[in-house]
Amino acid sequence: MRVAFHHIAYQPLAVCNALSMARLEATVRRAGLKPGAPVMDVGCAYGEVSMRLARAFDVRVTAVELDPVMAEGAEARITAAGLSDRISVRRGTSAATLTALPPFDLIMAIGSTEPAGKGLRDPAAVFAALSQHLTSGGALLWGDLFWKEEPPAPLRQLVETGGYYVSHEAWQTAARDAGLEVVSAEISDEAEWATYRTVMETAIADWLDAHPDHADAPTVAATAHRIKMMLDFGAPYLGFGHYLFRKG
C-alpha cells in the first residue's frame, strides 16, 4: 500500500489539527457526558483522541476512519492500550456509519472532510444533517479552519480543494440556522498552530531522511512542500476554530 503524507505526518500528533488535547478535553467537558455515553469520533486518524476521551470521560466511542492505513493503526493502538472494550473502530464513511447506528450524545468532527455525506458542504446543511444523529440534548463538537479575512482567490482555491470554509462568526451562524445552540466558540492560539506544524514537519523530514529511495518519497515531499507553502502564505488569513453546539 502506498505511503501518503498524512500517514506519516499524523502519526505523532495527539490531535491532527491546530488544537491542543487540553483545550479539546475542556470543550468535551462542557458537553456534560455521563459514563457510558455514546460518542462518535469522525475521522479518528490513529485513534489518539478516541483513546483520551474513553479514558478521561469513561465513554463508549465509535471511531470512524475511511483511510485503511490509519484505521489499521488506530485498531492497533487501541488494542495495545487495552481499550477495545470501549472503542470500536469503523472503517468507512461517517455518513454511512451514522445511518447504521443509534443517535449519539456527542459527535466530534475536527477537520473532517464532508462528514455529513459526499458533496454536502454548506455549513448549515452539514450541521442540520449531523444533528439528526444526536440524542435530545446531545452535542456536536466541530473544529475547522476559518477565514480571518477574505483571502486572495488563489489561496481560497488551494485551501478549499478538500473543504469549504467560512468566518468564525459564520460557523456559529450556520449552527444557529440549523437549530443548534452555540455553547462555546474558541480560536486556537499561535502555540497550538506552532506545535501542529512543527510535529508534522519534523515527522516528514525524519521519514524522508530515513527513506530517500522509497517509491513514494517524491510524492510525500511534494505534498509536504505544498502544505507548508499553503500554511505560510495563508497564515494572515487562516484561523482554526473549535465549537460546541447543542441540540435542543
Regions found by a protein language model. Give the residues of each.
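Glycine-rich SAM-binding Motif I of class I
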Residues: 47-51
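Class I SAM-dependent methyltransferase SAM/SAH-binding core
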Residues: 52-96
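A short acidic, Gly/Pro-enriched loop at the edge of an enzyme's catalytic core
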Residues: 98-107
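A short glycine-rich, Lys/Arg-flanked "PGG" loop and its adjoining helix->strand segment in the class I
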Residues: 124-139
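Conserved Class I S-adenosyl-L-methionine
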Residues: 186-248
